[in-house]
From Swiss-Prot:
GO terms for biological process: L-histidine biosynthetic process. Its main location: cytoplasm. The gene is hisB. It catalyses: D-erythro-1-(imidazol-4-yl)glycerol 3-phosphate = 3-(imidazol-4-yl)-2-oxopropyl phosphate + H2O. GO terms for molecular function: imidazoleglycerol-phosphate dehydratase activity. Pathway: Amino-acid biosynthesis; L-histidine biosynthesis; L-histidine from 5-phospho-alpha-D-ribose 1-diphosphate: step 6/9. This is Imidazoleglycerol-phosphate dehydratase.
Length: 196
């Protein structure tokens, strides 16, 4: 599989983020956002998606983690979009169900060029490791809208909030891997319109 590398740099009054990804990597990661729990989740996404991710984010964490988490989603979304290029030969769709002990999550993706997100999960704590749990959806929204994908994420059941969120991020990585996988039998893009 050939490499598909993209670099993105973004600086605002709230954050400064630089990323480099290889969609067809080995799942290597070097991620530093200043939010330990978020780093852990992004590491899982990269590893289980076999996507190489190098990312450094500096944000206004003295305020809270919202801007950093959302802007990381924006930058990773832009990186994925850039790395996908013309989307020729990709399978387009990806779905993954991932168990994490008592929790089960699913993520389904359509690299359609039409950004949309549906999240169906309810966490029972407000924070995990310095990250507001409501920011899981904010991250997924920023990612989906900046790649241009339809993304459905669901926790079917679970009790431990860490396990539920971990299952979502692992499923995200695996669904991305499936959707970006290239098939030599696909001539052009996987659409009757001829474009994605």
């Amino acid at each position: 599989m050939k490499e598909s590398i993209a670099k993105v740099y973004r600086k605002t009054g709230e954050t400064e983020i630089k990323s480099e990804i290889n969609l067809y990597g080995e799942g290597k990661y070097d991620i530093k956002t200043g939010i330990g729990f978020f780093d852990h989740m992004l590491n899982l996404m990269a590893r289980h998606g076999l996507i190489d991710v190098k990312l450094e984010a500096k944000g206004d964490l003295q305020v809270d983690s919202h801007h950093t988490v959302e802007d990381v989603g924006i930058v990773l979304g832009e990186s994925f979009k850039k790395a996908l290029g013309d989307k020729k030969g990709i399978k387009r769709y990806g779905t993954s169900f991932v168990p994490m002990d008592e929790a089960l999550a699913s993520v389904s993706i359509d690299i359609s060029g039409r950004p949309y997100i549906v999240c169906d999960f309810n966490f029972t704590v407000d924070k995990l490791g310095g990250m507001d749990t409501e920011l899981v959806e904010e991250f997924l929204r920023a990612l989906a809208f900046n790649v241009g994908i339809t993304l459905h994420a669901r926790v079917l059941y679970g009790k431990n909030n860490h396990h539920m969120i971990e299952a979502v991020f692992k499923a995200l990585g695996r669904a991305l891997r499936e959707a970006v996988d290239r098939d030599e039998k696909i001539n052009g893009v996987m659409s009757t319109k001829g474009t994605l």
